[in-house]
Amino acid sequence: MAELVIGLPRIERAVDMLSESIEPLLKSYGSLALPLPKSLCTDLVVEGIGGSEQSIEALSLKYYNPSLVRIWWSVIKKIPRLALEHPDSEIICYDEDTRPEKLEKASYRLASLLIRARLKIYERIDPRPWIEFFKPTSTGSIEIPETPVVIADGYVRFKEILGTASWKKAEKIWKLIPTPLELLEMIAKGYLEEKHAEEAVRFSVRYLGDYVIGSRDLTEAYEKLLNDKEYLDLLRRIDPNIARDLNPKIGRARTV
């Protein structure tokens, strides 16, 4: 049973806040699980200890594309040092290994969907290709290690872990809501009714085409989403509980 499950949005600011908490969590609980590729953690411990930041980045790029490395960099670069300084503690990565080439291919598919949708922005959008994009490629679920602390990135993963694992306490870092893309993922997985699909696609187009492309990083794009009254109204229509914690103090975890 996990003593603590922590959920955070997949953005730079939230990961930086998590990075500041990892060492205290290790000292308090002894081990924790991170949503990073399994082999990345192994490589960071076996090959990363004593290496430069450039060598650690090169190891990371074996499993992540540059944008994901940027998001997780403050945590990734700490793992070799923590493994050296806390030999009796354990950091386990539980996500499946994915090659950067596969991530890039998915990015191209998503960009293609975005371009086609923007050309039809004033017409009825067919959400089926978007739902198909987010359908799981395997029937099995990710195996969560039996560690005292489990970190979950993204709203969907946080809720999946809370729904399948045994846990005592759950907290959120910063403000955690599903992005429009996660709404589509929830529809594809059967967690959300398909009647919300067309609105989810329209907000996905806005999120990607206006917020992500027009921002310096994902943190800024996410902040724009948090201030999008239309989108927040959609979330409240879907489930009033989703947007209930939109104003926590920055830097503090919130108990679910």
What is each residue range found by the language model?
Residues 1-256:
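Compositional signal for N-terminal targeting/processing segments
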